[in-house]
Amino acid sequence: MPVSSDPKTFYIETFGCQMNFHDSEKVVGTLISQGYRQVETELDAGLILYNTCSIRDKAEQKVFHRLSEFRQLQKEGKRFAVLGCVAQQEGEKIFERAPHVSLVAGSASYRNLAEMLVQIESGSQRITGLDDRETDQTFETEFTARGNAHRGYITIIEGCDKFCAYCVVPYTRGKERSRSAESVLREARQMADAGFTDVQLLGQNVNSYHDPSGTMTFAELLTAVGEITGIKRVRFTTSHPRDFTRDIVEAIDNHPTLCDHVHLPVQSGSSKVLREMFREYTREQYLERISWMKATKNRKLSITTDVIVGFPGETETEFEETLALLDHVQYDGVFSFKYSPRPNTPALKYIDTVPEQEKSRRLQILMEHQREIQRANYRKHIGETIEVMVEAENATRAQWIGRTSQNKTLNFTVPQTVQPEIGSYHQVLVTQAFPNSLVGELVG
């Protein structure tokens, strides 16, 4: 394939969380507003951008592999940019490791991206956009290029002040800073006017949101977004148990547009390990929050979580406490990971007493344990009729892919005479269940 000679073309690859993917939508919008055109491969691009994740070492190494893989393209005049958490964490050291990189920019500097693009175009080298964690500014732009015409993100809070012992996010994303409720609601209305019906509010700790004017709590903001005409579903992620309050559950229970799904990372079922992690809650306090969600009057909430296994000092007994917590809560999904040492974090000072092989063993046990819980949970949906939003067609299986308000995938068949529209809502009868998805048939 011929290499594009147009320097104002770009390719972007995104690693990591929803925050990164939404940041990339804003970066893409800014690039397009500056006259750039997006292309599908590195080979066709004049500017190659990697929006990076550093939450675990494996994610961090992916970007350096990409930079090495395509290094020879610099000889053809292509420019490289490293964005996001690895950029903020490693800073100018990236230039030493990958001298062909022209721009290193953390997420807090994206508001200056247009100016940095001018520097790239003028031939400048080693351009940096690195803010300290004390910045009060958030990245708001009218140039968001949303990748989905029906489901979209709104970042309501950036940064993190929790400083968990294992986590690099406070050092790469800066301190917590919230957008005004007025700004969030304005963006939500614009999305509704543009045809979006499913809106997800984002933050590293989304429920730590504090309206700078003091007008709205997080629960009140959720409700206000859900009351906007045209919006059918409101989601939010990720929550921190420390700031998870009962009024959030009450809002979900009483407002059908607020999705009946909460992702509440626990990280460990052992109070001792949680204390070493600096999570600032106990097993019992976490389970109190679960009890609020189990006690709803109008809706049954789906609960998912994150778990780290093999944290320094975690004993077999403490690991078994985590397995017991899974049994107690009956999560609909668990994102589980082996502990990975990260730069600048307090846990680096701990003696990593759990061998890598043992971490892998525990992870496998936990995943298999949770898989059986999910298998039983998903089977309970058989015979139910559930509303889905149509996301895509799976032509090879003669099925359509839908998503429920509980964020579950429901693959379904339709009569030959029916052609659902992407983004439309339909009633589906569940006929089969698997540990990670449901299967059904269109009934309305």
UniProtKB/Swiss-Prot annotation:
Keyword vocabulary terms for this entry: 4Fe-4S, Cytoplasm, Iron, Iron-sulfur, Metal-binding, S-adenosyl-L-methionine, Transferase, tRNA processing
One Gene Ontology cellular component: cytosol
GO MF annotations, alphabetized: 4 iron, 4 sulfur cluster binding; metal ion binding; N6-isopentenyladenosine methylthiotransferase activity
Chief place where the protein resides: cytoplasm
Catalytic activity: N(6)-dimethylallyladenosine(37) in tRNA + (sulfur carrier)-SH + AH2 + 2 S-adenosyl-L-methionine = 2-methylsulfanyl-N(6)-dimethylallyladenosine(37) in tRNA + (sulfur carrier)-H + 5'-deoxyadenosine + L-methionine + A + S-adenosyl-L-homocysteine + 2 H(+)
Span of domain TRAM: 379-444
Record keyword Phosphoprotein present: no
Compartments, as annotated in UniProt: Cytoplasm
Cofactor info, note text: Binds 2 [4Fe-4S] clusters. One cluster is coordinated with 3 cysteines and an exchangeable S-adenosyl-L-methionine.
EC number(s) recorded for this UniProt protein: 2.8.4.3
Cofactor: [4Fe-4S] cluster
Binding site for [4Fe-4S] cluster 2: C160, C164, C167
HAMAP family for this protein: tRNA_metthiotr_MiaB
PANTHER family per UniProt: CDK5 REGULATORY SUBUNIT-ASSOCIATED PROTEIN 1 (PTHR43020), MITOCHONDRIAL TRNA METHYLTHIOTRANSFERASE CDK5RAP1 (PTHR43020:SF2)
NCBIfam families listed in its UniProt record: miaB-methiolase (TIGR01574), MiaB/RimO family radical SAM methylthiotransferase (TIGR00089)
Similarity annotation: Belongs to the methylthiotransferase family. MiaB subfamily.
Name listed for the protein in its UniProt record: tRNA-2-methylthio-N(6)-dimethylallyladenosine synthase
Species in which this protein is naturally found: Koribacter versatilis (strain Ellin345)
